[in-house]
C-alpha cells in the first residue's frame, strides 16, 4: 500500500462507528498486516499497536491475501506458517499498488528492487533518474523509500524544479528532498494524529509545541478535514 495510514484510518473509523448505539460491543475487528509492522515508522507503529490494544482491535502480521470466497465469506492468507483462513462479515481489501503499465514497460524502473511495483529508478535526494539524467519522477511512481502522499509531492516539486532549471542552464541543482511524508491519521470521528516523518523515520512536525504528532487531537482532525483539502485542491491547479 502506498500509504499505510489509509487502511488504518478505515479500521479506526469502522471501530468508532460500530462502537456507538445499539451495535456497541457486538463487533470484532481483525487487522491483517502484510508484513511484521503496522506502520513503517517504528514509533508510529508502536502507537498504533497501543491504540489497537486499547480498542480490542486484533492485529495479525505477515498475512498476505491470496483468495476470497464470497459465498462462504472466507479470506485466505499466505503466512510464514502456511495458508490461513479467516471468516468475515465485512472485508476491506487494499489492493497491491503498482506503477502504471506505461511506466513499468518504459525501461525506467528499478531492476533490483520494487520489481513487482515498477517504481522509477531515481536518486532519493534529487529525484533524478540514475541512468537517464534528463528524466525526473515525483509522486506515486518515484522509486524512493518514502513519499507517496500528496504532502510529499508538495515537497518534491520544488526539488525537481530546481534541478530542471539548473540542468537547462548547464548547472547543478542544490535542493534536496529528505523524504518528507505526511499522514493525517484519523483515529475516530473528530480526532486525528498529524504524523509527519522523513527518510530516517524521524518525526518532523510542522507545528512543534502546538500539535503533538502522536496525540489524538481535534485540531489535527480539523487540519485533515478543512485546511488540507483546500491545499490539495490548490495543488491540483498548480496554485500551491
Annotate the PLM regions.
Residues 18-117, 172-175:
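A Rossmann-like FAD-binding core segment of flavoenzymes
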Residues 4-7, 40-43, 147-151:
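Short, solvent-exposed loop/turn segments at secondary-structure boundaries
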Residues 118-136, 187-207:
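FAD-binding beta-loop-beta segment adjacent to the flavin cofactor pocket
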Residues 1-26:
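Rossmann-like NAD(P)H-binding beta-loop-alpha module
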Amino acid at each position: 500500500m502506498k500509504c499505510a495510514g489509509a487502511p488504518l484510518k478505515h479500521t479506526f473509523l469502522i471501530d468508532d462507528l460500530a462502537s456507538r448505539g445499539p451495535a456497541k460491543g457486538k463487533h470484532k475487528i481483525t487487522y491483517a498486516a502484510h508484513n511484521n509492522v503496522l506502520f513503517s515508522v517504528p514509533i508510529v507503529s508502536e502507537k498504533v499497536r497501543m491504540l489497537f490494544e486499547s480498542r480490542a482491535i486484533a492485529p495479525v502480521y505477515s498475512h498476505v491475501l491470496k483468495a476470497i470466497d464470497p459465498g462462504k465469506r472466507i479470506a485466505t492468507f499466505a503466512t510464514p506458517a502456511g495458508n490461513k483462513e479467516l471468516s468475515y462479515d465485512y472485508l476491506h481489501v487494499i489492493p497491491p499498488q503498482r506503477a502504471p503499465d506505461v511506466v513499468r514497460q518504459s525501461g525506467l524502473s528499478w531492476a533490483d528492487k520494487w520489481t513487482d511495483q515498477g517504481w522509477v529508478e531515481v536518486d532519493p535526494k534529487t529525484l533524478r533518474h540514475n541512468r537517464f539524467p534528463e528524466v525526473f519522477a515525483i509522486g506515486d511512481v518515484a522509486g524512493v523509500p518514502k513519499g507517496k502522499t500528496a504532502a510529499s509531492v508538495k515537497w518534491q516539486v520544488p526539488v525537481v524544479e530546481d534541478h530542471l532549471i539548473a540542468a537547462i542552464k548547464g548547472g547543478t541543482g542544490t535542493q534536496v528532498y529528505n523524504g518528507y511524508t505526511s499522514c493525517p491519521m484519523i483515529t475516530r470521528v473528530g480526532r486525528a494524529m498529524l504524523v509527519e516523518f522523513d527518510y530516517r523515520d524521524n518525526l518532523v512536525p510542522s507545528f512543534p509545541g502546538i500539535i503533538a504528532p502522536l496525540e489524538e487531537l481535534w485540531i489535527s482532525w480539523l487540519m485533515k478535514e478543512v485546511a488540507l483539502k483546500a491545499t490539495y485542491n490548490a495543488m491540483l491547479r498548480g496554485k500551491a
